[in-house]
Every structure is written in structure tokens, then in C-alpha cells.
Amino acid sequence: SSELCKEEKIKVLAQNVNDNLKGAFTGEVSIDMLKSINVDGVILGHSERREYYNEDDDLLLRKLKVSLENNFKVYFCIGESLEDREKNNHFEKVKNQLDKTVFKIDNIDPENLVIAYEPIWAIGTGLTASPEQAQEIHKYIRNLLSERFGNKISDNTSIIYGGSVKPNS
């Protein structure tokens, strides 16, 4: 199936990767394992992994570093809860997540990093972010990237929306 995906130009992403390259870590999947079956990248920072598996920013930073250092594409999720949104803390929440992870890395290759804005309140709740809300936070993220890494990196880093959508939105 990995060969078919390659032929059809379908990208296959893992939902997790271990932060160690070598060693005995039963139940974990290494970058080398994923690359050996033609996996194209990994999703890191998803709200469900943060909540159910207690993945904190320190662990996510280690996973992010090992992935990027090994030329493995990362789709890095950031976002806020409904409570953060309602208290107008969503900008601060997103900035804090970036400050503790992505912004701790010196050499970012925008070809290997995608920032996925994932408003937690818009995942499986029936709520969706409006196009205006998504654009507003995307612009904010782009500005933060520019401040930290400069325009060249900022302009070439993909930012996507990772929350729920409805047909009319």
C-alpha cells in the first residue's frame, strides 16, 4: 500500500513518533521505522495526544527536534480551548505553545514544517471556527513566525486549519 500511495502521490502521515532514534521502547515507533514504510511525515501536538497521553511541550519539543533533525516533515498542531477563546486568551495560548516548542529551534526548514491551527473547541463539538476567525489566527501565527525567524521562513511555512468544518463554512 505504501508503494501505491507513492505512485498516486498520496501523503501518508503518522499520528505519533518516539523522541528517541535508537533504543528499546516497546510499543513506540521510531522515525527510521516510519521512513522504512514510506511514511511522509508526522502529526505532533494534536490536542488528543496532549490530553489523553499527557504530551507536554517539553516532550513535543524533543519529538519536533528529532523529526526535523532527521528531515522528517512535521505537521505541528497548536490551538486553544473554548474557555481560552471565550476569555479572549487564544492569541496568548497559541503564542505560548509556539514559544515552548517551534520557537526553541534555531534552524527551521519551512519545507519540513507545517503549522496546523487546531482550535480544540471546534473538534467534534459541532462548533466551527468562522473563516474570519481562522484567517485572524493564521495571520497572527504568520506574524509570530516572521518576528522569530524572519520573512523568508515565515512566508514559506505552510499554515493550515485543523478544526471541524461544515458545508456552509
Question: Model-predicted segments: where are they?
Answer:
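Active-site loop-to-helix "anion-binding N-cap" substructures in soluble metabolic enzymes
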Residues: 1-116, 120-169
